[in-house]
Curated annotation (Swiss-Prot):
Cellular component GO terms, alphabetical: plasma membrane; proton-transporting ATP synthase complex
This protein's name: ATP synthase epsilon chain
Keyword annotations from UniProtKB, A to Z: ATP synthesis, Cell membrane, CF(1), Hydrogen ion transport, Ion transport, Membrane, Transport
SUPFAM superfamilies, sorted: Epsilon subunit of F1F0-ATP synthase C-terminal domain, Epsilon subunit of F1F0-ATP synthase N-terminal domain
Role noted for this protein: Produces ATP from ADP in the presence of a proton gradient across the membrane.
Protein localization: Cell membrane
Family label: Belongs to the ATPase epsilon chain family.
UniProt entry tagged with the keyword Transport: yes
Source organism (scientific name): Caldicellulosiruptor saccharolyticus (strain ATCC 43494 / DSM 8903 / Tp8T 6331)
Keyword Metal-binding included in the entry's annotation: no
InterPro entries named in the record: ATP_F1_dsu/esu_C_sf, ATP_synth_F1_dsu/esu, ATP_synth_F1_dsu/esu_N, ATP_synth_F1_esu_C, ATPsynth_dsu/esu_N
Protein origin, superkingdom: Bacteria
GO molecular function: ATP binding; proton-transporting ATP synthase activity, rotational mechanism
Gene: atpC
Pfam family, one: ATP-synt_DE
Length: 137
């Protein structure tokens, strides 16, 4: 299977940089799969899983949204937070979920509501990744 270069960048580190066969990530209007030779695009991506196929095997990471750019057989993803399941601190994720749920029970201005709703989605996504890894999904 043909490969392309994938770079996943965070403000503080290069999360992933290698040749891969395929990636699947959640875009705004649903999941998008990228393979070698994909048309150039730039699209926002949502909170969810980043699935990477390399050497015939899939690996998954939790991603907190970002921007994806495909250009000339190279994909660059910019995200504030991307983690392999083994990097996720379950207690921190649970605490973040509880904080967000507590805040969302209050009357908040729309911008704060959206911020805490996104924090809740990120925490739930991180916890799901831990559970799926534990269950072998």
């Amino acid at each position: 299977m043909a490969e392309f270069e994938l770079e996943v960048l965070q403000p503080e580190r290069i999360f992933f940089k290698d040749k891969v066969e395929m990636i699947v990530v959640r875009a705004i209007d649903g999941e998008i799969g990228i393979m070698a030779g994909h048309e150039p695009i730039v699209t926002p991506i949502g909170i969810g899983k980043l699935r990477i196929k390399k050497g015939g095997k899939w690996r998954e990471a939790a991603i907190a949204g970002g921007i994806l750019e495909v250009n000339q057989n190279k994909v660059v993803i910019l995200s504030d937070a991307v983690e392999w399941p083994e990097e996720i601190d379950r207690q921190r994720a649970l605490a973040a979920k509880e904080r967000a749920e507590k805040k969302l029970q209050q009357k908040l201005p729309p911008d704060e509501f959206e911020r805490y709703q996104a924090a809740l989605y990120r925490a739930i996504n991180r916890l799901r990744m831990i559970e799926e890894r534990r269950n072998g999904d």
